[in-house]
């Protein structure tokens, strides 16, 4: 897949000023250097784009990283970054409920999302001829998520996250070890003193408005890197 094609596809979706896109870094392999060559661009809307080409297989991997994780949560609202990761798969203005999963798998691809303390990322690996479709999916939920958020979806994912905490932490041998470790390593209120999964009482406390405010503050092209 040519670099120019990828750039045009995402710029058309996220920005109207292709000519202003800036190449800010280029790494080239020289000889037998152990280095991954790539080109790094910054779009006029602040989006960072990193491109690495490898034609050994007819596949493309798309990763969108938002520079926000559990460390950006407010005290009393822990677990929200991870909760929001779940909501990002529940449809957007032009993508129906659960359709994101169906579109990627129908294209012969795989997908997932992960959250840690400092970032949240979403990714797909698909046949290379499906690249533009993946970029469109990511652009749609970056720009057009909020109107598709409903109270019903919110409650379903709240229950899902609470169940995930029960399975992986509360009801698992030594599952709370990391939580106790974090509490003792960092003082109260430190953004690393709670786990990404959050506390059940905090998950019960948040509402749809909290979710929308979180999206508006952190989910935008100027806080994202596409690789």
Regions found by a protein language model. Give the residues of each.
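Short acidic/polar alpha-helix capping motifs at helix-coil junctions
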Residues: 4, 82, 176-179
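Sec-dependent N-terminal signal peptides
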Residues: 4-14
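Sec/Tat signal peptide C-region and signal peptidase I cleavage site
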Residues: 15-19
């Amino acid at each position: 897949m040519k670099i120019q094609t990828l750039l045009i596809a995402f710029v058309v979706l996220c920005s109207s000023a292709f000519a202003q896109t800036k190449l800010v870094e280029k790494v080239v392999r020289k000889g037998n250097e152990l280095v991954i060559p790539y080109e790094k661009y910054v779009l006029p809307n602040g989006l960072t784009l990193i491109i690495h080409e490898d034609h050994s297989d007819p596949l493309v991997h798309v990763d969108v990283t938002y520079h926000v994780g559990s460390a950006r949560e407010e005290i009393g609202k822990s677990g929200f970054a991870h909760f929001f990761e779940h909501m990002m798969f529940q449809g957007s203005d032009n993508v129906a409920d659960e359709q994101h999963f169906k579109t990627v798998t129908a294209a012969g691809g795989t997908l997932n999302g992960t959250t840690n303390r400092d970032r949240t990322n979403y990714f797909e690996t698909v046949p290379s001829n499906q690249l533009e479709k993946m970029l469109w999916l990511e652009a749609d939920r970056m720009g057009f998520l909020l109107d598709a958020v409903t109270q019903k979806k919110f409650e379903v994912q709240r229950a899902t996250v609470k169940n995930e905490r029960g399975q992986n932490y509360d009801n698992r041998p030594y599952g709370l070890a990391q939580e106790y470790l974090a509490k003792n390593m960092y003082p109260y209120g430190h953004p690393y003193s709670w786990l990404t999964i959050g506390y059940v009482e905090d998950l019960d406390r948040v509402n749809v408005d909290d979710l929308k405010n979180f999206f508006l503050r952190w989910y935008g092209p100027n806080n994202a890197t596409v690789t």
